Design a protein with these regions (language model features):
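Alpha-helical transmembrane segments
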Residues: 28-56, 354, 361
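Short helix-loop junctions at transmembrane helix boundaries
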Residues: 345-392, 404-407
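A hydrophobic alpha-helix feature that marks transmembrane segments and, especially
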Residues: 5, 30-35, 281-319, 327-332, ...
Length: 424
């Protein structure tokens, strides 16, 4: 029966071409948009984790309340012992201390006078310790534009766009003017080892990357850090695991009234990420519902048109004794065949487009000029195992619904009127 119905569909293009084309377009768009949203979500999570939040972040309670202001006077102290404790409690995670700071970067001329200066967003990380993961987390080798990565504590990296505005070359001296942990003025000289471009507008506008040892000396933060970031070993964020780790850590300090006691927060609870990710997932589900609804309506209309063209055929089949239920069932089987074929073609086309966008990306830097989010300027799709099957939901559901609704007209045909219909 299935082979017979399939041959009938292939021989009569009026019954198959338009419905298959509708399913192909709908499934292709569903697969592509799903992968696009998947890629955007991964982009947000990956960029935010690497540059800002980690998968989990440990701060003092007082610092956490004012984290947007980067209050280093409320930073964690006794960081070495806390790091040892974290390695013992969570040996499968990567832990790294960081210091955020703001200030002015002053570029002197040959006489030592100010030639140019600009506001800088500083980030002190562990660049030089043996086995440090920070160069890999920041992908410094890939981000390097000019010069080299720091090899000594007094060397820094600055963003390429910032360096061009200040006319700074690798090897030049730069003076950081900032504030110490105690609130006094901090002045320290550094050498620009190289320039970087992360492709993240929030970092590329005016970032400075320094080794944490030199920053601690400059900011009077010995054995202190504003934040300790934790990453899963595979660098893939898993919210349930992160929440479990945070709950376990925080339970040990629930009864501690000290404002400087450490507190762990997850990526999803920082910088509005939970709302952003929830919105993206809701949009992904909305895409499925919309395409199922639209395709069902289109295929319903196509089924009604097909019923008009096949009005006489259905009448003959009824006159020959074929039951209405059997005819209705064959119409649904034909629709499911159309849905399966259209879904396979649409999925293949959608995956091809997604793989291309995953490899090459789409530069949206012109839209991110004033962005404060830590998100890459190059948006990429991300193909996952779900991508291969997501198209079957709208492809099969829409064809089934369309055929089910349009085929109900069969039950309104009166057997007593068949001969009169055939005579006309």
């Amino acid at each position: 029966m299935i082979k017979f119905l399939f041959k009938g569909l292939m021989r009569d293009r009026s019954r198959s071409f338009f419905p298959i084309l509708t399913v192909v377009i709908g499934v292709m768009l569903t697969v592509f948009i799903y992968n696009w949203i998947n890629g955007a979500e991964f982009n947000f999570i990956d960029s935010s984790a690497r540059f800002n939040t980690g998968h989990v972040k440990i701060m003092s309670r007082a610092y956490a309340r004012e984290a947007d202001q980067v209050p280093n006077d409320l930073a964690l102290v006794g960081v070495r012992s806390l790091m040892d404790k974290l390695q013992e409690l969570y040996p499968d995670m990567i832990w790294t201390p960081r210091i955020r700071f703001g200030g002015l970067l002053d570029i002197p001329d040959a006489q030592g006078e100010t030639r140019d200066q600009g506001p800088v967003m500083g980030l002190a990380v562990d660049l030089l310790s043996p086995g440090s993961h920070e160069p890999r987390i920041f992908k410094l080798e890939d981000a390097l534009v000019r010069g080299r990565v720091p090899q000594r504590a007094e060397e820094i990296l600055i963003s390429e766009d910032f360096a061009r505005r200040l006319n700074v070359q690798p090897g030049d001296t730069a003076t950081l003017i900032s504030v110490t942990m105690q609130g006094s003025m901090a002045i320290a000289n550094f050498t620009v080892a190289g320039t970087i471009r992360f492709g993240v507008e929030a970092m590329d506008r005016g970032a400075m990357i320094a080794d944490i040892a030199a920053a601690r000396t400059a900011l009077d933060m010995e054995n202190a850090a504003g934040e300790i970031l934790g990453f899963f070993a595979d660098f893939l964020y898993r919210d349930p695991d992160a929440r479990q780790a945070a709950a376990r850590f925080n339970s040990a300090y629930n009864d501690d009234p000290d404002e400087f006691a450490p507190v762990m927060d997850t990526l999803s609870n920082q910088a509005g990420m939970a709302d952003l990710l929830a919105m993206m997932r809701m949009f992904s589900r909305l895409v499925l519902v919309v395409f199922i609804a639209v395709m069902s309506i289109v295929l319903w209309n196509a089924g009604l048109m097909g019923s008009l063209r096949r009005y006489g055929e259905i009448g003959v089949r009824l006159a020959m004794g074929e039951t209405k239920s059997h005819i209705y069932g064959t119409l649904i089987m034909e629709a499911l065949m159309i849905g399966a074929l259209g879904t396979l073609i649409g999925t293949a086309v959608g995956l091809a487009e997604s793989y291309y966008l995953q490899a090459h990306g789409l530069d949206i830097g012109f839209m991110m000029k004033n962005a404060s989010l830590f998100v890459s300027n190059v948006m990429r799709a991300k193909v996952s195992p779900v991508s291969y099957g997501i198209g079957f939901i709208p492809g099969m559901a829409a064809t089934f619904l369309g055929a089910s609704i349009s085929g109900l007209g069969i039950y309104r045909r009166q057997t007593s009127q068949l001969m009169k219909e055939l005579e006309t």
